[in-house]
């Protein structure tokens, strides 16, 4: 970094107690790079700071910002004039620090605007992603659609031109110490401006969390080239749409839908639920889980279950399941869902279809779902 360059913010993820690493430097991903080496290189290119700020002091300041969850603002006297050190924590849903962002430079220089970032937690037991209200600052999100917990299927449904679903599911459903992923996604769902997010994930299996901690950085840029699905994906999806075929990835051992491969089945309420497992009737979940061993051996399996509908009741639904090829964990299956004839109308776009039977407690975020249904795009953004 020369004296004429604008120093970027450095994002250091703190997703596990035992490790810290660099998630990004400015707009560029760093893929869990060694944070002390990165800081030493930055300081070496800023001689005034290198001469006045000891590496140990900088490390202590970063750890203090993480442990105390507070901003750090220091002004350092150097031979080239005063220099500034700024550290900002990135908070998750429990007020824990999921990352710290650091900027160093001349006190007279312009500090770049700090893009939005937020922490999230994947809880394996509930199969939900917990997110704080700060997630509404991410491009592509809105306060009207924000909920404190969401399923992984809902996250996948909001992103386009993404092909690493199996890797993500493997980490989330079989968390092992040391497992990590970093990737970028385009969020295209809803009425908001499309956003570009960089997501860093570390698996956790400890007293605090069984699942994973996430860091989501908003890296949306006006100069970002558009991402388009392949002709093959567009063609296959349109063929399934016209044929009325509905395919999903189902976690058989946990009786939940993880991802829609086609348009979601319109008679099934799968989104904005407090608990993703509520998509299937409680008495049918055990029957679905019992198919795991059979699928692991490579066989197909069929079962009829009661799937939650938008009227608050259940619609009989036939599932034809077969193993997902090449997936390392046994619980992942491809399911074809077919509606068994009944007199319950399917959800119609644009109408107030949400109902809660009298005397029944809500099972999901009905207001946010109604907002989504009223503003959803004419075509699904998922490919």
Please place each PLM-identified region on the residue numbering:
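PAS-family sensory domain signal
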Residues: 1-46, 104-153, 226-277, 364-380
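Sensory/regulatory domains in signal-transduction proteins
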Residues: 41-226, 267-351
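Short, charged, intrinsically disordered terminal tails
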Residues: 341-382
């Amino acid at each position: 970094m020369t004296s004429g360059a604008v120093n970027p913010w450095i994002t250091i993820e703190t997703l596990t107690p035992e490790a810290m690493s660099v998630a990004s430097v400015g707009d560029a991903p760093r893929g869990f790079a060694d944070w002390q080496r990165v800081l030493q290189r930055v300081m070496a290119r800023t001689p005034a700071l290198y001469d006045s700020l000891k590496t140990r002091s900088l490390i202590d300041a970063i750890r203090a910002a993480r442990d105390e969850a507070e901003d750090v603002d220091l002004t350092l006297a150097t031979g080239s004039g005063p220099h500034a050190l700024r550290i900002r924590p990135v908070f998750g849903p429990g007020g824990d620090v999921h990352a710290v962002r650091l900027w160093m430079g001349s006190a007279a220089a312009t500090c770049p605007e700090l893009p939005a970032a937020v922490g999230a937690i994947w809880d394996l037991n509930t199969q939900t992603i917990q997110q704080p209200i700060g997630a509404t600052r991410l491009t592509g999100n809105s306060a009207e659609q924000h909920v404190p917990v969401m399923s992984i299927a809902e996250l996948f449904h909001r992103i386009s031109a993404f092909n690493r679903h199996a890797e993500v599911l493997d980490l989330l459903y079989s968390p092992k110490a040391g497992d990590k992923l970093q990737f970028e996604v385009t969020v295209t769902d809803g009425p908001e401006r499309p956003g570009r997010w960089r997501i860093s994930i570390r698996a956790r299996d400890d007293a605090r969390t069984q699942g994973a901690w996430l860091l989501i950085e908003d890296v949306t840029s006006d100069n970002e080239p558009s991402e388009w699905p392949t002709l093959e994906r567009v063609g296959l999806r349109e063929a399934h749409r016209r044929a009325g075929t509905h395919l999903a990835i189902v976690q058989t051992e946990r009786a939940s839908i993880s991802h829609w491969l086609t348009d979601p089945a319109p008679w099934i309420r799968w989104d904005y639920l407090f608990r993703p497992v509520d998509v299937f009737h409680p008495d049918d979940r055990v029957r679905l889980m019992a198919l795991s061993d059979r699928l692991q051996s490579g066989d197909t399996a069929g079962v009829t279950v009661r799937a939650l509908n938008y009227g608050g009741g259940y619609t009989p639904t036939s599932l034809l399941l077969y193993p997902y090829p090449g997936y390392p964990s046994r619980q992942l299956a491809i399911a074809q869902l077919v509606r068994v004839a009944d007199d319950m109308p399917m959800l119609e776009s644009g109408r107030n279809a949400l109902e809660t039977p009298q005397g029944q407690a809500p099972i999901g975020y009905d207001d946010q779902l109604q907002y989504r249904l009223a503003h959803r795009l004419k075509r699904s953004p998922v490919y």
